[in-house]
């Protein structure tokens, strides 16, 4: 997420997304079923890499699995309510919770994981709208709010809900989590700025105007993302 932010800023908004008179042009998702399919493939697969990150069957922790599920539930519920049934928020809500719980899934009490996921779901919905509508940063997939901000919140949440006072297993420091999270954010953002800055300077990041108008799916892969646009109306 923090690698994506400089890339999105350097790339710039889609043509016509923000007009000179301050209006925002709507660009609805091209395929809601595929959006849902992709999000839930990630959600199901998340349990594979998060629970099996120990890489040994003997080391698998049931707590990690339960906490992953609880965070997913929290993220889904808050995204459903705050996103007002928007499918983009509904299907990304569970991912927001799962992103956030990764850092502390082996430490937190399940209720702490639920709270972590719920806050992440709310954070994603709120910051996606702020990013797009107020700051006019055209992060189409919401990668920065979903992975960057929810991931940073998860790093901090591990230091909060991992404490014994809140039902966690302890052995974690909020100060250390803050420092580690800030360090990770800094390295990712600065590294991305350098790499994408060089790419923009010497190669270029955008398609040509005609290819942008037709869309990357049609221009690069020769398949339109929206079949209804192939009609003659």
Summary of predicted features, one role per range:
Residues 1-233:
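Hydrophobic alpha-helical transmembrane bundles of multi-pass membrane proteins
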């Amino acid at each position: 997420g923090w690698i994506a932010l400089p890339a999105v800023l350097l790339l710039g908004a889609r043509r016509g997304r923000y007009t000179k008179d301050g209006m925002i042009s709507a660009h609805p998702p091209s395929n809601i079923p595929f959006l849902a399919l992709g999000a839930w493939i990630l959600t199901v697969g998340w349990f594979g890499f998060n629970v099996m990150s120990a890489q040994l069957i003997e080391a698998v922790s049931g707590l990690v699995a339960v906490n992953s599920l609880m965070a997913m539930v929290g993220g889904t519920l808050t995204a459903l309510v705050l996103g007002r049934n928007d499918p983009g928020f509904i299907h990304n809500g569970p991912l927001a919770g799962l992103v956030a719980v990764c850092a502390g899934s082996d430490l937190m009490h399940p209720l702490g994981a639920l709270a972590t996921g719920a806050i992440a779901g709310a954070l994603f919905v709120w910051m996606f709208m702020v990013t797009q509508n107020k700051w006019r940063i055209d992060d189409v997939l919401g990668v920065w709010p979903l992975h960057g901000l929810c991931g940073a919140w998860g790093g901090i949440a591990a230091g909060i809900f991992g404490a014994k006072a809140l039902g966690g297993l302890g052995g974690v420091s909020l100060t250390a989590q803050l420092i580690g999270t800030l360090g990770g954010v800094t390295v990712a953002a600065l590294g991305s700025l350098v790499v994408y800055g060089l790419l923009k300077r010497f190669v270029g990041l955008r398609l040509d105007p005609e290819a942008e108008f037709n869309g990357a799916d049609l221009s690069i892969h020769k398949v339109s993302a929206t079949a209804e646009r192939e009609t003659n109306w």
